[in-house]
């Protein structure tokens, strides 16, 4: 996809990694209706693209995303404004649901401030990394609307109930180090190293078996709301499904071969397990 002025995102493919980049730097990469629909369309295409093993979301310029594009809010009566936000919320939620559903791992590469719905979209990704100058702000209180973009779902699960309440009610800005401490991001990198480190992580994700990553995503998402009995039963079902996949047959054959037994992986396993 081109990144010209006709589009609000670009999509780049490198080494099995697809990067969805928000390309509205003059608008702080605010989420216009077009940006959200283009992102959703891109995710649908990438879901069925076998050449893609991982998906990165990032922003062009100095900002990840400023959330809702308030310049699109109509000047009409309250009912018209409510209809506008209802439609935009549906777009946002469709993107977030797709990020949760897609088997391929998603990585939020937060290159600058993540605000409001931009923060929400980053929370919906499987992993998140940021530059050391990134900041994180709920912002919903600032503009007079209730929190959305899945923040009610993901924040308590990621940072815990007390911190989620504190953050949303006080509306304070978190810097990169505090965001890391709270678990909002997995890693913080210097701005100079950011792109290369994002590439390393994304390529590592892309190299892993997609079907297994999808099973992991499903279990982590569903397991937190299940009983222990239900969770372990679903794990057994996933194990049975995975050992019936050709990938497992290949790995088992490799493990049984002399080449595998003499590899570094086998040595590490022997060391850990006390083998000879």
From Swiss-Prot:
Function of the protein: Dehalogenates 4-chlorobenzoyl-CoA, 4-iodobenzoyl-CoA, 4-bromobenzoyl-CoA and, at a slower rate, 4-fluorobenzoyl-CoA. Does not dehalogenate 2-chlorobenzoyl-CoA or 3-chlorobenzoyl-CoA.
Temperature-related behavior of activity: Optimum temperature is 45 degrees Celsius. Activity is lost after 5 minutes incubation at 60 degrees Celsius, but one-fifth of this activity is restored after cooling to 45 degrees Celsius.
Protein name: 4-chlorobenzoyl coenzyme A dehalogenase-1
Record organism: Arthrobacter sp
Active site: residue positions: 93, 148
Keywords: Hydrolase
SUPFAM superfamilies the record matches: ClpP/crotonase (SSF52096)
pH dependence of this protein's activity: Optimum pH is 8.0 in MOPS buffer at 30 degrees Celsius, 7.5 in 0.1 M potassium phosphate buffer at 30 degrees Celsius, and 7.4 in 20 mM potassium phosphate/2 mM DTT buffer at 30 degrees Celsius. Retains full activity in MOPS buffer between pH 6.5 and 10.0. Is irreversibly damaged below pH 6.5 in MOPS buffer, enzyme treated at pH 6.0 in MOPS buffer only regains 40% of its original activity after re-equilibration at pH 7.2. When treated at pH 5.2 or 10.1 in 20 mM potassium phosphate/2 mM DTT buffer activity is lost completely, but is recovered within 17 minutes following readjustment to pH 7.4.
Pathway: Xenobiotic degradation; 4-chlorobenzoate degradation; 4-hydroxybenzoate from 4-chlorobenzoate: step 2/3
């Amino acid at each position: 996809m081109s990144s010209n002025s006709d589009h609000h995102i670009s999509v780049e493919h490198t080494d099995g990694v697809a990067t969805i980049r928000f390309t509205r730097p003059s608008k702080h990469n605010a989420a216009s209706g077009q940006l959200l629909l283009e992102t959703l369309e891109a995710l649908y295409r990438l879901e069925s693209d076998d050449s893609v093993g991982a998906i990165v979301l990032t922003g062009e310029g100095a900002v990840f995303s400023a959330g809702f594009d308030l310049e699109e809010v109509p000047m009409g009566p309250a009912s018209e404004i409510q209809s506008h936000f209802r439609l935009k919320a549906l777009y946002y939620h469709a993107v977030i649901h797709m990020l949760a559903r897609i088997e391929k791992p998603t990585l939020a590469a937060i290159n600058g401030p993540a605000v409001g719905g931009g923060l929400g979209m980053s929370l919906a990704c499987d992993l998140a990394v940021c530059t050391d100058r990134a900041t994180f702000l709920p912002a919903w209180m600032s503009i007079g609307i209730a929190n959305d973009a899945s923040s009610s779902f993901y924040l308590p699960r990621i940072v815990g109930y007390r911190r989620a309440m504190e953050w949303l009610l006080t509306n304070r800005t978190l810097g990169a180090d505090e965001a890391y401490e709270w678990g909002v991001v997995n890693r913080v990198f210097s701005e100079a190293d950011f792109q290369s480190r994002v590439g390393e992580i994304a390529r590592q994700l892309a190299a892993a078996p997609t079907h297994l990553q999808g099973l992991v995503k499903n279990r982590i998402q569903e397991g937190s709301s299940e009983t222990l009995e239900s969770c372990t039963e679903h794990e057994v079902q996933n194990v049975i499904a995975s050992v019936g996949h050709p990938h497992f047959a290949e790995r088992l054959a490799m493990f049984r071969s002399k080449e595998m037994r003499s590899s570094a992986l086998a040595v590490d396993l022997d060391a850990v397990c006390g083998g000879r």
